[in-house]
């Protein structure tokens, strides 16, 4: 009798352990669909979004903070013309996560992040494609110095391109005070390096990729696509096959003195760009 009870106890413990292991999968599979009226807190609390690692704090650095934004709806948080596309994209992020896709990838190595913690925020968010040729696009949103476009043009455009069958990556790069030594352009270069080095894993071809940039992201894509010393050649990667820039800063020279006076005085060095760009 004792032997039988022991076997029952062991069986119960094993079942309990299996149940615990399956909880994250079960939780992600029971993720809710998002709408324009979903709040930021509801989005961030969703199991699939949590598991995905997708960055959703795109306006909190503007001074209003988490408490102000967390109960705002996606309609209030996102740009009016992009709300529907961005909401659909977040539903796609959740769906991909439920299907076992690793959405978030760190661009810099753990050793590099340990040496410079600001590098930890540099991430790629992946939307796997279906096209047989494996062409991919890298979307680089704007940032307005204190807020990023990851939940606006970044994800909205990525989802639309993904609908067309392309593999798409959205780049989250350093902004505000973490952009010394021309950090954002370095982040873009390293992101392309990362995709190139992991092309087989992502099922993409390393050549003939497209860069799609908006605002400051458009400026970065333009600089990277050039043959200058700060362009793609500096990172030993193929030249972009296509360059699409939306409302970019084409010539930074006009606003460089103002930017330098506002952002750089305490650092005693150029921050967002090289002095000869």
For each feature predicted by the language model, list its residue ranges.
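Short beta-strand element of the alpha/beta-hydrolase
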Residues: 134-142
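Catalytic nucleophile-loop/oxyanion-hole region of alpha/beta-hydrolase
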Residues: 149-156, 171-206
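Primarily recognizes the serine-hydrolase "nucleophile elbow" in alpha/beta-hydrolase
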Residues: 190-261
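Serine-hydrolase catalytic core
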Residues: 269-277
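Short beta-to-alpha linker loops that shape the active-site pocket of alpha/beta-hydrolase fold enzymes
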Residues: 143, 172-176, 249
């Amino acid at each position: 009798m004792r032997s039988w009870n022991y076997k029952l106890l062991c069986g119960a413990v094993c079942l309990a352990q299996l149940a615990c292991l399956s909880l994250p999968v079960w939780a992600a599979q029971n993720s809710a669909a998002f709408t324009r009226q979903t709040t930021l807190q509801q989005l961030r609390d969703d199991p699939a979004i949590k598991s995905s690692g997708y960055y959703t704090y795109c306006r909190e650095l503007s001074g209003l903070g988490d408490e102000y934004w967390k109960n705002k709806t996606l309609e209030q948080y996102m740009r009016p013309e992009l709300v529907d596309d961005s909401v659909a994209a977040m539903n796609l992020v959740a769906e991909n996560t439920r299907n076992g896709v690793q959405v978030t990838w760190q661009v810099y190595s753990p050793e590099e992040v340990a040496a410079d913690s600001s590098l930890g925020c540099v991430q790629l968010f992946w939307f796997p494609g279906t096209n047989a040729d494996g062409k991919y696009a890298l979307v680089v949103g704007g940032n307005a110095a204190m807020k990023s476009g990851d939940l606006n043009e970044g994800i909205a455009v990525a989802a639309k391109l993904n609908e067309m069958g392309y593999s798409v990556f959205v780049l989250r790069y350093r902004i505000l005070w973490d952009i010394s030594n021309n950090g954002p352009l370095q982040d873009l270069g390293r992101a392309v390096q990362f995709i190139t080095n992991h092309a087989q894993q992502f099922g993409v071809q390393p050549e003939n990729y497209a860069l799609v940039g908006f605002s400051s992201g458009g400026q970065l894509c333009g600089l990277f696509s050039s043959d200058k010393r700060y362009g793609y050649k500096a990172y030993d990667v193929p030249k972009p096959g296509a360059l699409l820039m939306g409302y970019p800063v084409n010539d930074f020279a006009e606003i460089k003195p103002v930017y330098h006076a506002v952002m750089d005085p305490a650092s005693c060095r150029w921050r967002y760009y090289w002095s000869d760009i």
